[in-house]
Amino acid sequence: MVDSTEYEVASQPEVETSPLGDGASPGPEQVKLKKEISLLNGVCLIVGNMIGSGIFVSPKGVLIYSASFGLSLVIWAVGGLFSVFGALCYAELGTTIKKSGASYAYILEAFGGFLAFIRLWTSLLIIEPTSQAIIAITFANYMVQPLFPSCFAPYAASRLLAAACICLLTFINCAYVKWGTLVQDIFTYAKVLALIAVIVAGIVRLGQGASTHFENSFEGSSFAVGDIALALYSALFSYSGWDTLNYVTEEIKNPERNLPLSIGISMPIVTIIYILTNVAYYTVLDMRDILASDAVAVTFADQIFGIFNWIIPLSVALSCFGGLNASIVAASRLFFVGSREGHLPDAICMIHVERFTPVPSLLFNGIMALIYLCVEDIFQLINYYSFSYWFFVGLSIVGQLYLRWKEPDRPRPLKLSVFFPIVFCLCTIFLVAVPLYSDTINSLIGIAIALSGLPFYFLIIRVPEHKRPLYLRRIVGSATRYLQVLCMSVAAEMDLEDGGEMPKQRDPKSN
């Protein structure tokens, strides 16, 4: 009885219930994610997720360890170049493996379900909900604090506004994909314009002769290997997000062209903006002011913009809002693909029958973020995943090299020289080693969180469905059925129109 119910739910995409067919094709319209992300949307998604609040609030991490303006700018440039290498590797992976899910999909393709599940488990427990909750809290703090100029804003006020922000963006992305991309475009423009204002103000000051901070700019530099490593690590953390578009590969129009082109446009934009923004900061503020500031851009605005200094706190809030939207889009697709591959409950990979949005996965992601908002010391959780993040990014690139060897004749619309993935792999070894050395306890906790998924994988995921406990099958079947009705959703069909794609994998049957 239970099994038949589940198969009935899964078969419903074949029912002729798609009223939105445009008449171009004789059969019923497929229920799958639609290709609605254009080149411009792709650029805004990457830029919007890479440029968060960090460049406004705390770009001083690089300066602390480099100890000079000159060396810090060099490290920002090196961090940008390294990120370009990683983004180019992901461009090849995204055009070769045309599945959403970024590193999860690539690890699954190269190494199978076990490592892919551990990557998904880490994202589910720590990376995605923690980062989204923190971005939402930062947004709320910058919106609420001006109302309490002489004291700290109430804890409940910022958390409630953060929750409202998560709910609003979840609703927008549930309604229409186009609404989500429109929000992303608008808020990306806003944050870029704010940084351009900072850059222009700095250049004007520099043109007026305020160049004293750049005299002997390398004086006092710390060339110790450990300090340079930590400075570079801080820079690379600010550049994270270049893989955002790979989470939505199946929704990109003409991905063979637009995915690598979006990456190729976005990376120079962000790198140049980061370097010039720091030049502007260094022109106006001395090292002591920067290191003492809790929000460098706000300190900069107080000295430059006068009565218009409110622009920067507002820009930080807008930047967080856009970054949160990009994170919600990416994370929901990760959970969607994880469900489709059998690593999460089937209900999460369903799609709204009229709007063609992954409503269940968006709701699941939103609920997880709201739960983590209830954690009072949530900022501590962010320290646990640096090791895991870079480990799985590096493992994806190792998978790229492995697939080059295992499947040399596989169609690759974009094929890089092996120089790029090899260099990136060597650098990720460094990025994995740095947190183990500098933040050993938190890194070990992060590893333990990742390994906590082992019992779940071997006792549930790897067990064939008919051998799972009857009560569990009944609960999952009932939840799937009710969620399907509640969300007006059916199981998504796999998009196989691109050559080389494999049909839906279910982990218990793999290997």
Swiss-Prot record:
Result when mutating M50K: In LPI; failed to induce cationic amino acid transport activity
Residue positions where Phosphoserine is found in the record: S18, S25
Residues glycosylated per entry: N325
Disease per UniProt entry: Lysinuric protein intolerance: A metabolic disorder characterized by increased renal excretion of cationic amino acid (CAA), reduced CAA absorption from intestine, and orotic aciduria. On a normal diet, LPI patients present poor feeding, vomiting, diarrhea, episodes of hyperammoniaemic coma and growth retardation. Hepatosplenomegaly, osteoporosis and a life-threatening pulmonary involvement (alveolar proteinosis) are also seen. Biochemically LPI is characterized by defective transport of dibasic amino acids at the basolateral membrane of epithelial cells in kidney and intestine.
Membrane topology: Multi-pass membrane protein
Protein family according to the UniProt entry: Belongs to the amino acid-polyamine-organocation (APC) superfamily. L-type amino acid transporter (LAT) (TC 2.A.3.8) family.
Location(s) in or outside the cell: Basolateral cell membrane
UniProt cross-references to InterPro entries, sorted A to Z: AA/rel_permease1 (IPR002293), AminoAcid_Transporter (IPR050598)
Lineage, top ranks: Eukaryota, Metazoa, Chordata, Craniata, Vertebrata
Function: Heterodimer with SLC3A2, that functions as an antiporter which operates as an efflux route by exporting cationic amino acids from inside the cells in exchange with neutral amino acids plus sodium ions and may participate in nitric oxide synthesis via the transport of L-arginine. Also mediates arginine transport in non-polarized cells, such as monocytes, and is essential for the correct function of these cells. The transport mechanism is electroneutral and operates with a stoichiometry of 1:1. In vitro, Na(+) and Li(+), but also H(+), are cotransported with the neutral amino acids.
Protein's UniProt keywords contain Transmembrane: yes
Domain of life, source organism: Eukaryota
Tissue expression from the record: Highest expression in kidney and peripheral blood leukocytes. Weaker expression is observed in lung, heart, placenta, spleen, testis and small intestine. Expressed in normal fibroblasts and those from LPI patients. Also expressed in HUVECs, monocytes, retinal pigment epithelial cells, and various carcinoma cell lines, with highest expression in a colon-carcinoma cell line.
Transmembrane segments: 37-57, 69-89, 107-127, 133-153, 160-180, 186-206, 222-242, 259-279, 304-324, 383-403, 416-436, 441-461
Pfam families: AA_permease_2 (PF13520)
Residue numbers spanned by region Disordered: 1-28
Upregulating conditions: Expression is stimulated and enhanced by IFNG/IFN-gamma.
Subunit structure: Disulfide-linked heterodimer with the amino acid transport protein SLC3A2/4F2hc.
Keywords noted in UniProt: Amino-acid transport, Cell membrane, Disease variant, Disulfide bond, Glycoprotein, Membrane, Osteoporosis, Phosphoprotein, Transmembrane, Transmembrane helix, Transport
GO annotation terms (biological process): amino acid transmembrane transport; basic amino acid transmembrane transport; L-arginine transmembrane transport; L-leucine transport; regulation of arginine metabolic process
One Gene Ontology MF term: L-amino acid transmembrane transporter activity
Catalysed reactions listed for this entry: L-leucine(out) + L-arginine(in) + Na(+)(out) = L-leucine(in) + L-arginine(out) + Na(+)(in); L-leucine(out) + L-lysine(in) + Na(+)(out) = L-leucine(in) + L-lysine(out) + Na(+)(in); L-leucine(out) + L-ornithine(in) + Na(+)(out) = L-leucine(in) + L-ornithine(out) + Na(+)(in)
GO cellular component: basolateral plasma membrane; plasma membrane
Full protein name: Y+L amino acid transporter 1
